[in-house]
């Protein structure tokens, strides 16, 4: 990841919270929004991790990042591949596998688990598309493909692939409509 890519990812994240990219808005969100502050440090640690020139700063950045992980209950690794526009509206109990892939402009609500399955026919890691809304308490694990603009309902356990623009609900998750995430995803800045 290059510096300008880091800047684009952070700008896209900030835009999801504020709806604009003014510096004052970004600074205000950094101060008042735990979700944006965490995603900023997560992306910064990921950038430092990939550049050996900056490895000397990684332990210091990691301390701040880890403190925010513990304080707000975010279990999202800085090594995870997440597109720009990550929106964390609530904190507490969000766990994402370090090898999961999450697209651009996605919402992760509280108590979401996106995990890897190490055995069985679903062995693998989830791949989440762009503009996906994942509701509170949802669980997605294994080699699951979640299509673009899908919505996963609260407490839904996803055990099979989710088509594009589908709305999943229940345990195990079933498609209940094809209205997608349009009403849940706001302030997108394109695909970063």
Predicted regions located by residue number:
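Terminal amphipathic alpha-helical/low-complexity segments used for targeting or macromolecular assembly
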Residues: 1-72, 183-192
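Serine/threonine-rich low-complexity intrinsically disordered regions
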Residues: 2-5, 18-22, 148, 159, ...
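Intrinsically disordered, low-complexity regions enriched in small/polar residues
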Residues: 5, 19, 89, 106, ...
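Glutamate identity and glutamate-enriched acidic tracts
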Residues: 5-8, 50, 98, 131, ...
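Left-handed beta-helix
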Residues: 72, 77-78, 83-84, 89-98, ...
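Conserved beta-strand-loop-alpha-helix hinge in the C-terminal portion
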Residues: 166, 171-186
């Amino acid at each position: 990841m290059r510096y300008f890519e880091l800047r684009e990812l952070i700008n896209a994240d900030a835009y999801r919270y504020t709806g604009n990219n003014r510096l004052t808005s970004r600074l205000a969100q950094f101060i008042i929004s735990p979700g944006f502050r965490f995603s900023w440090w997560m992306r910064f640690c990921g950038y430092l991790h990939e550049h050996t020139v900056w490895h000397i700063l990684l332990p210091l950045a990691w301390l701040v990042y880890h403190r925010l992980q513990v304080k707000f209950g975010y279990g999202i690794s800085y090594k995870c591949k997440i597109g720009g526009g990550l929106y964390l509206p609530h904190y507490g109990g969000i766990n994402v596998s370090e090898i999961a892939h999450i697209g651009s402009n996605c919402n992760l609500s509280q108590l979401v688990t996106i995990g890897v399955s190490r055995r069985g026919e679903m062995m693998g890691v989830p791949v989440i598309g762009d503009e996906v809304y994942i509701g509170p308490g949802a669980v997605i694990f294994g080699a699951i493909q979640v299509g673009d603009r899908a919505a996963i309902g609260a407490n839904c356990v996803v055990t099979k692939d989710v088509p594009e623009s589908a709305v999943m609900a229940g345990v195990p998750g079933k498609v209940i409509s094809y209205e997608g995430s349009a009403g849940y995803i706001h302030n997108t800045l394109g695909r970063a």
